[in-house]
């Protein structure tokens, strides 16, 4: 140890003349017949600076690390041909790529070294990965121990355990033999592989270390080197984003292009020339206009269509957004049509995704239906559910148990008995009877003797005045269709039976009388004699009404 230290001191004082020879000889002795002479020459030319810095470090720390540094230094520079676990070591003039499990992608500007101890060597790059890797460059000599991060002017990159260094273009290392390659893209998919663009370096996992052409990075378990352009390190489904788009999924990378993004299930890795998109089970990558990623094999569509239906339902219309549930009702500009299970309306400008939260988004419409969602088109907003009621600009025909068409000119509301009412016309019919509007209901036969009751006192006075004669009281309402139907007949009976007193009570105007007489429905007819009720009839029953009057009088 003392001899080595003295040699170091003498070589530094005398200049850089003696040390290179000593270093070269030492390297030749430890190389054991290494044929890679170019790397030795490059390293030997850098020895003076390296020795100087190592000497300074040794003196600062009481000369304790110099032997270890020189030993590790020589050992690492000579291990290029001895890779662990039988990994192939391809070599090029500008870069060296070492992928895992026989994958060996090579580019003219890339250096990839992911695994324990792979040591590719190039004239401009030295990559050493292990706990105490010592990268060497022409300007810097850094002696890191366990997670130190040396930096050189060229590229020293040292990843450990699956670290994936990236060059200025794109390296791709897929697992299990999948090696897709595009002219501008290389996508790495292994459960957490990260696609890289020309301006991004993204490495997710416990110690991923992205790399640029101007920075050397030497991380261990979580060290995060950052490049001059964009370094992104997402962990487990983090989604880095590049100037165009870079998306990294877990389990089933799904890249998407600017025209059509297609996502296959679990492991399919389609490649586009512009965009790499990789979502995780439902991640939604977005392209300049549309990027849609459905779950479990859903297929996102082109710039104008992103349709993800459930059970094959693919509704599409030219200007509509339709989301059917077992009977959803897609609507057109003039008609409302209700398709059930399997109806496939299709539109070029809509995006329809009915299922579990899939959220496709397009520049014109983003529609997300889930079991009874409410799709809304530029001109219509329709909500159908079992017995949906579609409404169009000109027609609205909602069918449920009773058809209730509604238009600006006609409105029909049936309750037990049909009671349609409109702004201009009220035409309720029951059993063929034709009702008359209020203007006509006032036209009763000549000699009409029906008295209208306005208050409780008036009602009591009328009963007292009648004495022993039969009093027939009609409890009705103006909004009641059957009441309007039988009212003319009631007035006709008043002419026919002159010995009977006919009274008419408006249920809305005389609520006190209605409560006292316990009226439950309209029309109701009550019959009094001597101020006491003798009979009651509910409903617009003409024949029965006439029979009761004839019997009681």
From Swiss-Prot:
GO biological process: cell differentiation; cell redox homeostasis; spermatogenesis
Expression by tissue: Testis-specific. Only expressed during spermiogenesis, prominently in round and elongating spermatids.
GO molecular function terms noted in the UniProt entry: thioredoxin-disulfide reductase (NADPH) activity
Pfam family, one: Thioredoxin
Domain Thioredoxin: 429-553
Biased composition (Basic and acidic residues): 99-143, 173-209, 233-254, 278-376, 385-439
CDD domains, sorted: TRX_family
Modification Phosphoserine, positions: 362, 392
Disordered as annotated region, ranges: 1-37, 77-442
Sequence repeat windows: 113-127, 128-142, 143-157, 158-172, 173-187, 188-202, 203-217, 218-232, 233-247, 248-262, 263-277, 278-292, 293-307, 308-322, 323-337, 338-352, 353-367, 368-382, 383-397, 398-412, 413-427, 428-442
22 X 15 AA approximate tandem repeat of Q-P-K-X-G-D-I-P-K-S-[PS]-E-[KE]-X-I: region residues: 113-442
Keywords: Cytoplasm, Developmental protein, Differentiation, Disulfide bond, Phosphoprotein, Redox-active center, Repeat, Spermatogenesis
Signal peptide (from-to): none
Disulfide bonds: 480-483
GO cellular component: cytoplasm
InterPro entries linked to this entry: Thioredoxin-like_sf (IPR036249), Thioredoxin_domain (IPR013766)
Compartment annotation: Cytoplasm
The protein's role, per its UniProt record: Probably plays a regulatory role in sperm development. May participate in regulation of fibrous sheath (FS) assembly by supporting the formation of disulfide bonds during sperm tail morphogenesis. May also be required to rectify incorrect disulfide pairing and generate suitable pairs between the FS constituents. Can reduce disulfide bonds in vitro in the presence of NADP and thioredoxin reductase.
Official protein name in the record: Thioredoxin domain-containing protein 2
């Amino acid at each position: 140890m003392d001899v080595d230290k003295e040699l170091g001191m003498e070589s530094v004082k005398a200049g850089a003349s003696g040390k290179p020879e000593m270093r070269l000889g030492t390297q030749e002795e430890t190389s054991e017949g290494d044929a890679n002479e170019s790397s030795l020459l490059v390293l030997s030319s850098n020895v003076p600076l390296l020795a100087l810095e190592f000497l300074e470090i040794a003196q600062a720390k009481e000369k304790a690390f110099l032997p270890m540094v020189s030993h590790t230094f020589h050992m690492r520079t000579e291990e290029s041909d001895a890779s662990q676990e039988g990994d192939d070591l391809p070599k090029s003039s500008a870069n060296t790529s070492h992928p895992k499990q026989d994958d060996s992608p090579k580019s003219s500007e890339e250096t990839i070294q992911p695994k324990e101890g792979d040591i590719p060597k190039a004239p401009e790059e030295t990559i050493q990965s292990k706990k105490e890797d010592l990268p060497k460059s022409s300007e810097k000599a850094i002696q890191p121990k366990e997670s130190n991060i040396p930096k050189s002017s060229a590229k020293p990159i040292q990843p450990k355990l699956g670290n994936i260094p990236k060059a200025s273009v794109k390296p791709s290392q897929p697992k299990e033999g999948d090696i897709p390659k595009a002219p501008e893209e290389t996508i790495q998919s292994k459960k957490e592989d990260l696609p890289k663009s020309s301006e991004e370096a993204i490495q997710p996992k416990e110690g991923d270390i992205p790399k640029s052409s101007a920075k050397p990075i030497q991380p261990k378990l979580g060290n995060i080197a950052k490049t001059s352009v964009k370094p992104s390190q997402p962990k487990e489904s983090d989604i880095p984003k590049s100037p165009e788009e870079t998306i990294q999924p877990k389990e089933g990378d799904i890249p998407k292009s600017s025209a059509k993004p297609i996502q296959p299930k679990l492991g399919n890795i389609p490649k586009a020339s512009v965009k790499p998109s990789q979502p995780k089970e439902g991640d939604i990558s977005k392209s300049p206009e549309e990027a849609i990623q459905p779950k479990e094999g859903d297929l996102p569509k082109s710039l104008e269509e992103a349709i993800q239906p459930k059970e094959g339902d693919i509704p599409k219309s030219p200007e509509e957004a339709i989301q059917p549930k077992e009977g959803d009702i897609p609507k057109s500009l003039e008609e409302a049509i209700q398709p059930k299970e399997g109806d496939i309306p299709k539109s070029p400008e809509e995006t329809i995704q009915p299922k579990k939260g899939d959220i496709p988004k397009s520049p014109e419409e983003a529609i997300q239906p889930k079991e009874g969602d409410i799709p809304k088109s530029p001109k219509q907003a329709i909500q159908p559910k079992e017995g949906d009621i579609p409404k169009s600009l000109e027609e609205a025909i909602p069918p449920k148990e009773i058809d209730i068409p509604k238009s600006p000119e006609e409105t029909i509301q049936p309750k037990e008995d049909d009671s349609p009412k409109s702004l201009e016309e009220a035409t309720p019919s029951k059993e063929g009877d034709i009702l008359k509007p209020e203007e006509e209901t006032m036209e009763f036969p000549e000699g009409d003797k029906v008295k209208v009751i306005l208050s409780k006192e008036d009602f009591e006075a009328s009963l007292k005045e009648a004495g022993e004669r039969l009093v027939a009281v009609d409890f009705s309402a103006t909004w009641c269709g059957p009441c309007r139907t039988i009212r003319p007949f009631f007035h006709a009976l008043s002419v026919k039976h002159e010995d009977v007193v006919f009274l008419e009570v408006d249920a809305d105007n005389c609520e006190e009388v209605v409560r006292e007489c316990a009226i439950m429905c309209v029309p109701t007819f009550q019959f009094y004699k001597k101020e006491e009720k003798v009979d009651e009839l509910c409903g617009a029953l003409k024949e029965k009404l006439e029979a009761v009057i004839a019997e009681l009088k």
